[in-house]
């Protein structure tokens, strides 16, 4: 039950990831094969639920790629269910301050360190109580990544970084750019300056900085600055753009021209 993704972040080894939004165990297993270090199962913007997350965790399990799960919200009940089906690494969206970061951490810990309910006899996470001392070991293997996606969260970043149990901080460039007044343009110089400053600040605090960006040049720039978990693509976008390009090569250029309008997108 060792969380190798958490261990890699702690050791300072950069982890390259891919975003999963197709909500399919079949495509999740397909994408566990190319060699990405981690795969993000998105429960915030993709049509996932606990059952679909479970099937994707099962599909990814035989492969080296490590699953990270994003719940729809910083909700202890939802987090409890995701942990019980086997999630060990969570990416918690829209964390605005230290109190919300503490709430996320406490939701992943059994008492007295937190509020996670004990139901290991029913849980895939404990292999239905077949893992010896699971209740004693589980807390240390939980990896909590919190998302900062607004100017308020950026302002509160020093306090968020002080929260014990926060392993990493993920900068959400799409929502951050919108909050800064540059919706759809995360590559705006002001947004980029804020992102770069945050990456350095997070790393200096001994936490792991993370981000999603499909622009290869920017992804490499963030890695140079010290980002440790970087998602470099999204399954839905990869499929859509490849299909559009194939159609265009056979004379249908309408869909590919529409895609070209979104060159500044995170995805």
UniProtKB/Swiss-Prot annotation:
Enzyme Commission code: 4.1.2.52
Annotated binding of a divalent metal cation, by residue: 149, 175
Coiled-coil regions listed: none
An example molecular function term from Gene Ontology annotations: 4-hydroxy-2-ketopimelate aldolase activity
NCBIfam families listed in its UniProt record: HpaI
Family: Belongs to the HpcH/HpaI aldolase family.
Designated name of the protein: 4-hydroxy-2-oxo-heptane-1,7-dioate aldolase
Encoding gene per record: hpcH
């Amino acid at each position: 039950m060792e969380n190798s993704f958490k261990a890699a972040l702690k050791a300072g080894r950069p982890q390259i990831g891919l975003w999963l939004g197709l909500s399919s165990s079949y495509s999740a297993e397909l994408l566990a094969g190319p060699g990405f270090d981690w795969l993000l199962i998105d429960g915030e913007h993709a049509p996932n639920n606990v059952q679909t997350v479970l099937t994707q965790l099962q599909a990814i399990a035989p492969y080296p790629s490590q699953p990270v799960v994003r719940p729809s919200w910083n909700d202890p009940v939802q987090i409890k269910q995701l942990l019980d089906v086997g999630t060990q690494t969570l990416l918690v969206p829209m964390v605005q301050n230290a109190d919300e970061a503490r709430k996320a951490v406490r939701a992943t810990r059994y008492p007295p360190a937190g509020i996670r309910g004990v139901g290991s006899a029913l849980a895939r996470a404990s292999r239905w109580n077949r893992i010896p001392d699971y209740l004693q070991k589980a807390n240390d293997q939980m990896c909590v990544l919190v998302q900062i996606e607004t100017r308020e969260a950026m302002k509160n970043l020093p306090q968020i970084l002080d929260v014990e149990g926060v392993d990493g901080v993920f900068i959400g460039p799409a929502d951050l750019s919108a909050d800064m007044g540059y919706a759809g343009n995360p590559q705006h110089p002001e947004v980029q300056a804020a992102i770069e400053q945050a990456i350095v600040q997070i790393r200096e605090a001994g936490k792991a900085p993370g981000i999603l960006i499909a622009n290869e040049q920017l992804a490499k720039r963030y890695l140079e600055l010290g980002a440790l978990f970087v998602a470099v693509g999204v399954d839905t976008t990869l499929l859509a753009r490849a299909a559009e390009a194939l159609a265009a090569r056979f004379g249908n250029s309408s869909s590919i021209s529409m895609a070209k309008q979104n060159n500044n997108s995170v995805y």
